[in-house]
UniProtKB/Swiss-Prot annotation:
Principal subcellular localisation of the protein: membrane
GO biological process: glycine betaine transport
Record-stated family: Belongs to the drug/metabolite transporter (DMT) superfamily. Small multidrug resistance (SMR) (TC 2.A.7.1) family. MdtJ subfamily.
InterPro entries linked: Small_drug/metabolite_transptr, Small_multidrug_res, Spermidine_export_MdtJ
Record text on subunit structure and interactions: Forms a complex with MdtI.
Biological role stated in the UniProt entry: Catalyzes the excretion of spermidine.
Membrane-spanning intervals of the chain: 1-21, 31-51, 54-74, 81-101
Gene name in the database record: mdtJ
Membrane topology type: Multi-pass membrane protein
A GO molecular-function descriptor: amino-acid betaine transmembrane transporter activity
Identification of the protein by name: Spermidine export protein MdtJ
Pfam families: Multi_Drug_Res
UniProtKB keywords: Cell inner membrane, Cell membrane, Membrane, Transmembrane, Transmembrane helix, Transport
Source organism per UniProt: Enterobacter sp. (strain 638)
Amino acid sequence: MFYWILLALAIVAEITGTLSMKWASISDDNTGFILMLVMISLSYIFLSFAVKKIALGVAYALWEGIGILLITLFSVMLFDEALSTMKIAGLATLVVGIVLIKSGTRKPTKQPKEQAHATV
């Protein structure tokens, strides 16, 4: 569970960093660039710890997929970016892909260790 929390923190940091980049590009303040640098760095740090127990392909797909989905939604709400039918179709496909990747991942079952038999 701890590693899933780290992955969630990585996703939040990625979203915050990317939105900060956009904010910095439309404002005259350098604070956005500093926040972007810090948050994207934290995102990679959290992701690197999360993949200790979460399969890399699953963690990366969730990190990027959920990040893209939420960044797109927030950019529409915060920066008045357009959301076309093609973007909606792409986001829907992305959600389906995330669900398929996550549902196709199973924990490996632990094989019971054979007991060593003493030989005489």
